[in-house]
Amino acid sequence: PPEFREEMAGIADALAKTGSQLDLHDVLLWNTMYDSWCFFAHPNSSNQAQTFERQKYPIGCSSFSAWGEATRDGTFIFGKNMDNLNLPGILEGRMLVVCDPDNGLGHVNVSHPGMIAIDGGINENGIEMMTQYSPSIYETMRGCGIAVLSRLILQNASRVDDALNILTVYPRCTGINYHVGDAKAQRAIVIETNAKQIAFRRPYKQDILWTTNHYNCYPGWMGYQGENLVEGQKLAFCLKDVKSIESWQESLKDKSNPYLSATGRFRQYEKLLSELYGEITMESGIEILSDRHNPDTGELRDWETAPKARNDGNTIAFWAAPTTFAEKVKFYKSNLETSIVAHTGNLWSMIATPLNGDFRIAMSDFPAQRGPYVHFNLFEELNR
């Protein structure tokens, strides 16, 4: 969209005035960072029948929403964990952004310097949206990136259907689960997408909804009826069998599969939300986002104890052992040479009641849930 390009041009102009070597092309490229990372970590989809060795990628993100009968006072509550790598500059570059655009809705999101958005937030009309990485064989870089789509929704959506329309009309790049909620209407859906397909699932029988990093749009599963997105994820995750719901669920539990994204977190969210049903508050929501119990054994792990494997023992608030991604990297403008070694963990965690604008954000520690959740109010920040 031209208004976003204009905003990026303003960022580039400001950088130039500081003497930076970075220009508009760099800012544009930086705003595709998330999509480039997702795309790099995906298999080649040109031959869907081929066998391949996938690039291992970090596990990323999860969220839940609860309202009505699920919460203590009926208030719509939304929680999100942003999980990714602590690459150079990422931790010190975490930034809470309050945006009051000339045209559109005021909103808040967590981003990084130079980015117009990255992963969703809440807006002044009571809409929340967050993204969860969910790989598919249907990938492209010829479309709108996650940052652009997130910003479009936050700035323009007043209903869940508005978000669904935006994701339908604009071309998409990588596989993403968009968790969208409307606090006024007390409605939430998870829109599961890739470059080719889009489907959405509703809450199943109760006033709770959650998502992690795999598709759940499988006909007959949790009341869903529609296109099967799991078929396009089979090769991406090297799932053994997705011919039936039972075989698909067993494949997701495969602890020896090195490509799965800690699928036990989905089951753990269901367990915790069900146990707290009717009594969910912002405080108990923080406990859910900070949960470190093994989904299979119930064992509590220490903050910096890594799981046995990617799909064995990873928790909602997780921590992975450090990985060397490159022995030597030369940055193309600064000529800085360094190795890249990083943990996967929680970069930030948010709990919100979008209707009244209250939210609490943890982003000072790593993993972030170990630090304080600091209170803000969107309407106060916007001077409404």
Describe the predicted segments one by one:
Residues 1-147, 170-177, 384:
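A contiguous strand-loop segment
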Residues 1-60, 154-384:
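C-terminus-biased signal that marks the final domain/tail of proteins
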